[in-house]
Amino acid sequence: MLERLNFIENKYEELSIKISDPTIIADQKKWQKLCKEHAELEEIVMKYREYKEALQDLEDNKEMLREETDKDMREMEQEEIKRLGDIIEKREDELKILLLPKDPNDDKNVFVEIRGGAGGEEAALFAANLTRMYTRYAEIKGWKVETISLSATDIGGFKEIVFMVKGKDAYSRLKYESGTHRVQRVPDTESSGRIHTSTATVAVLPEVDDVDIVVNQNDIRIDVFRASGHGGQCVNTTDSAVRITHLPTGLVVSCQDEKSQLKNKEKAMKVLKSRLYEKAQEERNASIAEDRKNQVGTGDRSERIRTYNYPQGRVTDHRIGMTLYKLDSFLNGDIDEIIDALITEDQAQKMKSIGSR
């Protein structure tokens, strides 16, 4: 581990010199690339330097303890040695996590797809609740949300919605939301007060670069139609909405958010590329934990990653067995506590996997 950390520190120092070089600054594209590399290494280098400093302080204090004869001073030195030992142990754990292989998609923007599953109209209303939850979470994080396509019901539910989230670390945090979400509550339309169980499926896809996936124009069919609003009413008098069908796979993507047909086509192509990229990833390794195919399933009630229980004010994530009794704030975007716990569990599993090799 130390050999690798020394290499990273040397690389960081080399980059520090390069990004201050006027000849490199003149080439903005190259300079920005080097600045990005430099920023990515900064956290681990700072932690490593703190770790080395604590090691040196520990050795100095041990030396002082060996030479000290005063009882009170020896007790103080022993307390300091224990404190430094705790710091070193903590820094070692932090460095191990920072050295874990990074998901290449973590710094990308994302497409979020939410569909009502089992439960009919109530499932569509729950899909709308989840959409609001992620929209509020994005606002808290300072991310930007753009609707790509929406199929709404007459009473405000969402049969299906696709939206894009743009911002720092969007995929690294939202990727854990892929799966089937279950809600238990008394619907507004239920006169007997019976609790109903419904589901909605969430899929989180990273935005892909043009170099990541190439779409042959001969493999797609593009249809245009008039955009519709809530309940299906027409909201546009021109054929601005776009539907793209990828003929080899049968994947279909629609976009009607923009008034411009060209902009809708561009957005739909981005979603299509992300879906094709995800499909290629699934075929390359069917066991990848983040695959939507494995996580989302069919939307059946028996498949779930999280339950939202309204009568108890409870949200439970079944992957880590974590329960929070703050449903209202959770649905209002306060979801970091569970996401942080999922990230910690993911990191622990990766460390365990590396340690068993």
Curated annotation (Swiss-Prot):
It holds the Pfam family PCRF. Transmembrane segments: none annotated. Residues 283-309 are annotated as: Disordered. PROSITE patterns: RF_PROK_I. The modification N5-methylglutamine is found at residue 233. The keyword Cytoplasm applies. Residues 283-306 have a biased composition (Basic and acidic residues). Keywords: Cytoplasm, Methylation, Protein biosynthesis. It is found in: Cytoplasm. It comes from the Bacteria. SMART domains: PCRF (SM00937). InterPro entries: PCRF (IPR005139), Pep_chain_release_fac_I (IPR000352), Pep_chain_release_fac_I_sf (IPR045853), Prokaryotic/Mito_RF (IPR050057), RF-1 (IPR004373). Methylated by PrmC. Methylation increases the termination efficiency of RF1. One of its GO terms (molecular function) is translation release factor activity, codon specific. GO terms for cellular component: cytoplasm. PANTHER family: LD18447P (PTHR43804:SF7). Belongs to the prokaryotic/mitochondrial release factor family. Peptide chain release factor 1 directs the termination of translation in response to the peptide chain termination codons UAG and UAA. This is Peptide chain release factor 1. The gene is prfA.
